[in-house]
Amino acid sequence: ALSIDLKLQYLAYRELRQAVATHKAKAGSVVVLDAQSGEILALANVPTYNPNNRSRYDPGRARNRALVDLFEPGSTLKPFTIAAALESGRYTPDTVIATAGGALPMGRHVIRDVHAAGDLTVAQVLQKSSNVGTARMALSLPPRDLWAVLSSSGFGAVPNAGFPGEAGGRLRDPKTWKPIEQATMSYGHGISVSLMQLARAYSIFCTDGELLPVTLLKRAEAVEGTPVLQPKTARAMRDMLQLVTQPGGTAPKAQVAGYRVAGKTGTAHKLVNGAYAPDKYASSFVGLAPASAPRLIVAVLIDEPSAGQHYGGQVAAPVASAVLSGALRVLSVPPDLPVPRTPIPEVLDPVGEEV
């Protein structure tokens, strides 16, 4: 039997369709995974078509974008860089990183944050999405160490969900990385992923460090994951990812009443004819809930929002919030947060997030 839950599928599609219309986006996708079994519970794409009505068919509408389309993830990749830094033993969540004036000169290039933030702890680098802080950590690691965490998290390999034409993305051999490439890859540029790959990769933060195999078929029994991180690293990452959805983070709009949500925003300029387009964005959010013992992973991509807002925390996080809110209720997942949701402050611009 298929693992797709029809209630969650409809919920994901409804929220995605509304967000794509609201933000005048070119397209969008949502993936909902069972964080304990790796089962795909929902897989929605917009635009789409009804296979019973061939008159509106065109190949662009029929594509399962979440599985076959690739994008540069931007800041949704930062947790994997920070996890590699924690794994090295040289950093803890409280280690202070100097982000100076929000600029890190590297030869002819400069890594920039949108807003200068001064000294930040590792946890704050993640919460505020600092490119400079993330790049500094990445550059202190041997390239192979960063590559090992990315590769073992499933990047650069087909996820094998059981769908024809799945994309494997691009993760280059670390022997070929120049320092500037290692720096930009640390915050999700120069690497390409599918939304399914990204959703699956976040399973390492749900399972105490194991990467789950994903499937479109119901699983009769529990599956073994592949170890990627030490359990203490995975738990530390989950704690830090909760800061992202709290005031001071980039995604308070991902909050869900009664549940702790951990997650990360991404806002990446898109490549057009080999150059980054200043006004075309891939805006994303990946959320885990309840964060105390995750049951669901929801990944959202809004492609080329053009109605004014473009940060992942503005356009993708609210979709994840709505999908999680409905899905947790449908699945009767007990709340892990006693307090009612407080009024959400306006989303802060990420410190970094864009390049």
PLM features: what roles do these ranges have?
Residues P305, Q309-G326:
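Amphipathic oligomerization regions
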Residues E15-A19, A84, V149, M240, ...:
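Generic non-transmembrane alpha-helical segments
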Residues A1-G28, Y49-N52, Y57-R61, S325-R329, ...:
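Extracytoplasmic/periplasmic proteins that interact with beta-lactams or build/remodel peptidoglycan
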Residues Q9, Y13, W147, A234, ...:
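Hydrophobic face of alpha-helices
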Residues C206, T245, S321-L328, S332:
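Short amphipathic alpha-helical signal-transduction/dimerization elements
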Residues I4, V30-S75, F80-S306, G312, ...:
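Beta-lactam-recognizing serine transpeptidase/beta-lactamase-like catalytic domain environment
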